[in-house]
From Swiss-Prot:
GO terms for molecular function: cytokine activity; growth factor activity; heparin binding; identical protein binding; protein homodimerization activity; protein serine/threonine kinase activator activity; signaling receptor binding. Acts specifically as a negative regulator of skeletal muscle growth. It comes from Rattus norvegicus. Disulfide bonds join 273-283, 282-341, 310-373, 314-375. Homodimer; disulfide-linked. Interacts with WFIKKN2, leading to inhibit its activity. Interacts with FSTL3. Gene3D superfamilies: 2.60.120.970, Cystine-knot cytokines. Keywords: Cleavage on pair of basic residues, Cytokine, Disulfide bond, Glycoprotein, Growth factor, Heparin-binding, Secreted, Signal. Belongs to the TGF-beta family. The gene is Mstn. The record marks 99-100 as: Cleavage. This is Growth/differentiation factor 8. It is found in: Secreted.
Amino acid sequence: MIQKPQMYVYIYLFVLIAAGPVDLNEDSEREANVEKEGLCNACAWRQNTRYSRIEAIKIQILSKLRLETAPNISKDAIRQLLPRAPPLRELIDQYDVQRDDSSDGSLEDDDYHATTETIITMPTESDFLMQADGKPKCCFFKFSSKIQYNKVVKAQLWIYLRAVKTPTTVFVQILRLIKPMKDGTRYTGIRSLKLDMSPGTGIWQSIDVKTVLQNWLKQPESNLGIEIKALDENGHDLAVTFPGPGEDGLNPFLEVKVTDTPKRSRRDFGLDCDEHSTESRCCRYPLTVDFEAFGWDWIIAPKRYKANYCSGECEFVFLQKYPHTHLVHQANPRGSAGPCCTPTKMSPINMLYFNGKEQIIYGKIPAMVVDRCGCS
């Protein structure tokens, strides 16, 4: 007769045989599949975050530049409008698109709207200039509102002088148009200078007009335009005021530099990852924004820049560095939605672009590069 303990053993063995072979790797495979599925979900989440970040950047740029829509300027128009002048070439050639300054200093710029540094203004037509003596004259400049509310540091009028065949002395005169006086006077002098030119190519000449510009800003009604003359010894005018064939980009223009004082704020620290990272915590990932891919030809430089974005989890176990958020959760765990992975430090980019008035602006746009991410 079989005793009870032995009978239990037989029953257990019978159940094992009936159940079939046991796969000892089943649990590990299940765990691997769960982990793989989690990584795929993380990749999809990051892809959605990248797309959202790019769309947000487009909206932010227009908003920070105070543009309702992207300026509609064709590539042909850009080639004609871009002056072939030293200050613009210098901006493009020595262009500091962005710098990785996430480790220097403890303060950062966090103002919202773009801080303008240089504005290049092209001349426009004026009814007053057309009526002066029955034919067009140059030049009339309209000024962006950015200039009126910022401190003018420098204002230069740039004019291009055509090449000469023999050495000559050139007398340059800049006249400001005024309302006709009783004696018929319609002009008053701004600047005059004498320079020697040698045979060869034409040259760019700059003239300080800061005082005149400041007066125009104080009394906009006094801005009726200017007339430019550059006469050689034979009375020939060498100044390019209305470019002819082969003279595209040689228009006179104003280069105005302004300054603004941005606000400052404190910084913190965060994790850096790449697209192949398996890090689940809140982290900064690389992202390059290509303006040419948008069809935004109105942005002269940069054509692309590194924007970066934040993605990852913000579990409360990671919150040793964020005690205020942790305390809120402890006080009301059901009512707290938890922290989000978000930029904790951002830096500006410099941008050279056309605004809606076909003026060339060189400015600094704040908070366009994610330098660090964190949970908050």
